[in-house]
Structures are given as structure tokens and as C-alpha cells.
Design a protein with these regions (language model features):
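Adenine nucleotide-associated cytosolic modules
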Residues: 1-268
């Protein structure tokens, strides 16, 4: 289907790019991206994907908007406090871009529902704030052969990596297992600078856009870290040997999804 005159104007700064053009914009409009977590990472990622014209955006989050969220979760407004995050996010996106269909999942992801939720999406963004959820997302995406972007933020630091089936290590290749409960402070205990979510969440959106367009180099096989205090990015090459991984290796020992105990941070 041809782009409308309004779409040509709306996405004109995309279309003029040789890496995008009208063909690439149509790819974006036909794409489906799932964001798990409508918080500090998921909020900016969702807004930039919506602005870019990603045609279907899924948002999964069981929580309600809290006043303390507004310091960084820019998709929500003061009037949204007490509202379901998925509903608040949907309303913001609908007001921003009528080209975008928003699917909402007001539920915690578990081993029982995640495969059904992710099955229809082209790319998954992990915007969660706890290790059990991150390992569950990783394992589900590996088993379902879904590309995804992992990210995490705390204090003045952030990190992200991208997994594409068959093109490098997964999250479990690098981090093996969740740390013991209480071994790592929650975001409520440690704090996080608000703009950190904007920096890292926007990079997650960029990874999704590049994957959809098929342009550039993704963060497969690399972990990108950012320190806002020193204003330094570091791109760390990850081990390329994935054969021994418990989930994506040649002889996986994890063949069923695991529900580790989740400690939900109201400030993610």
C-alpha cells in the first residue's frame, strides 16, 4: 500500500534518508514491537517507536502510575497517577500518532503467559527492572527465536545488548543466572538519574528500528555501557562461543521456562 500524503509529510525526515526511504518507512509501519515494562526504559522506547511509525506496539506492565515514576517515565503525566501504566502509555501514543496500533497486556510476565504474548511480534524490548524477569524474557525469546534488546539502568550507569537468533550470545551466555535475592540493591534503594532511561531506552528503540530496516550494526555480540558521570561509552566484545550456554547452546540444559522469584520495584 502506498504512503498517504500525510504520512509522506509526517515521516519526511525518515524518507529522505537513503537507509530508510519510502520502502523502509513501509517496513516500520508493518512492523510489530513488544515492550515489556512501561517504565524508565520502556517509556522513551515506546515514544520514539511510535513517533517513527512502528505500526503495532505491544506494551506489557501490571503496575499503576505512581508519583515517583514521573521523574523519568516520560510517557506518563501527573494526571495519570493511579492509572494503569499500559493505559496511560496507550493514550499518549494514540495522541501522538494515529498510524500506531497499541496492544496492552496488564499483567506480570510469567512462564505461563510470555510465549503467547511474544509470539506475534518481530522484536522485543526488555524494559524490566529485575533479574528474574530479564532471564525469563531472554529464555523465552531464545526458545521462540525472537530478537530482543536487553537493557538496565541504575544510578548514573546503563548498559544494553541485543540478541538475534544465531548471531551471537544471549543474556544468559553473559550473566549465567540471576544473582541471589538482596545481593543487588533495587532501583528504589539505589536511585537512578531520570535522563538515564532516556539515553538507554532511546538506544533500545534505535536497535529495534535498525533491525526492522535491516541497516547498520546491531549490538549483537557486544555489551554497550554508559557512565553519565564520566560521559563515557564503552563497547565490550562478548565471547563468541555460545555452545556451552544452558539455553542457546548446542546441548541446552534449560528446555522449559523458569519463574525465578521476582522483586518488583515500584520505581522502575
Amino acid at each position: 500500500m502506498a504512503l498517504t500524503d500525510e504520512q509522506i509529510e509526517r515521516y519526511s525526515r525518515h524518507i529522505i534518508l537513503k537507509e530508510v526511504g519510502a520502502k523502509g518507512q513501509k517496513k516500520l509501519l508493518n512492523a510489530k514491537v513488544l515492550i515489556i515494562g512501561a517504565g524508565g526504559l520502556g517509556a522513551p522506547a515506546a515514544m520514539y517507536l511510535a513517533a517513527a511509525g512502528v505500526g503495532t506496539i505491544g506494551i506489557a506492565d501490571a503496575e499503576e502510575v505512581d508519583l515517583s515514576n514521573l521523574q523519568r517515565q516520560i510517557i506518563h503525566q501527573t494526571a495519570d497517577v493511579g492509572k494503569a501504566k499500559v493505559q496511560s502509555a496507550k493514550e499518549t501514543i494514540n495522541a501522538m500518532n494515529p498510524d500506531v496500533t497499541v496492544n496492552t497486556y496488564r499483567e506480570f510476565i510469567t512462564s505461563d503467559n510470555i510465549m503467547d504474548i511474544i509470539k506475534d511480534y518481530d522484536f522485543v524490548i526488555d524494559g524490566t527492572d529485575n533479574f528474574p524477569a530479564k532471564f525469563l524474557i531472554n529464555d523465552a525469546c531464545v526458545m521462540a527465536k525472537k530478537p530482543f534488546s536487553h537493557a538496565g539502568i541504575i544510578r548514573f550507569k546503563g548498559q544494553l545488548m541485543t540478541y538475534v537468533p544465531g548471531e551471537g550470545p544471549c543474556y544468559r551466555c553473559v550473566f549465567k543466572n540471576p544473582p541471589p535475592k538482596d545481593a543487588v540493591p533495587t532501583c528504589k534503594q539505589a536511585g537512578v538519574i531520570g535522563a538515564m532511561g532516556g539515553v538507554i531506552g532511546s538506544l533500545q528503540a534505535m536497535e529495534a528500528i535498525k533491525y526492522i530496516l535491516g541497516v547498520g550494526d546491531l549490538l549483537t555480540g557486544h555489551l554497550l555501557t554508559y557512565d553519565a558521570i564520566t560521559q563515557e561509552f564503552h563497547k565490550i566484545k562478548l565471547p563468541s562461543d555460545t555452545e556451552g550456554c544452558a539455553v542457546c547452546g548446542k546441548h541446552p540444559t534449560i528446555t522449559e521456562l523458569i519463574d525465578y522469584e521476582q522483586v518488583v520495584c515500584e520505581d522502575h
